[in-house]
Regions:
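Extracellular carbohydrate-recognition regions
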Residues: 1-45
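Surface-exposed, low-complexity/disordered Ser/Thr/Gly/Pro/Asn-rich loops and linkers
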Residues: 30-91, 98-103
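Short coil-to-beta strand junction motifs in C2/discoidin
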Residues: 104-112
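Conserved aromatic beta-strand anchor motif in extracellular beta-sandwich/beta-rich domains
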Residues: 113-117
């Protein structure tokens, strides 16, 4: 992961409509997903970030195998939250569509949402 100087503020929204192929570097630290309009079935947005074992160029990962392996990831730039209080009722939401026009999820596939802290420690919140 690279050091990022761009801190995002709320509200943060990305429907990937302003980019083709790669995530917007102003919002995302990496580009290990394919942004496209062909894989979503009846998409709610113009484009989608595809988590499907295809790299950012649409090619199968070189290390792909029938055994579980680490593949796609999308990491946001830091989001400024230090001015918020519990009364602000902050919510993170995202739209997830398993399979779409692509390969159906395997029993060993997983989708993990992680929140990072300044000290670079992570807490798994959803699996």
């Amino acid at each position: 992961m690279r050091k990022v100087s761009n801190t995002l503020t709320l509200p943060l929204f990305d429907d990937f409509s302003e980019v083709n192929t790669y995530p917007d570097a102003a919002k995302w630290q990496n580009r290990s997903v394919l942004i496209n309009s062909g894989f979503p079935k009846f998409p709610t947005n113009y484009n989608a970030a595809t988590f499907d074992a295809l790299d950012e160029t649409g090619k199968v990962y070189y290390h792909a195998s029938s055994s579980p392996f680490v593949a796609d990831s999308l990491i946001s730039n830091p989001i400024k939250l230090n001015d918020l209080t519990p009364a602000d009722s902050l919510y993170f939401s995202f739209y997830y569509q398993p399979q779409g026009n692509g390969d159906a999820p395997e029993a060993t596939d997983s989708l993990v949402l992680m929140f990072g802290y300044v000290l670079d420690t992570f807490k798994i919140e959803y699996d």
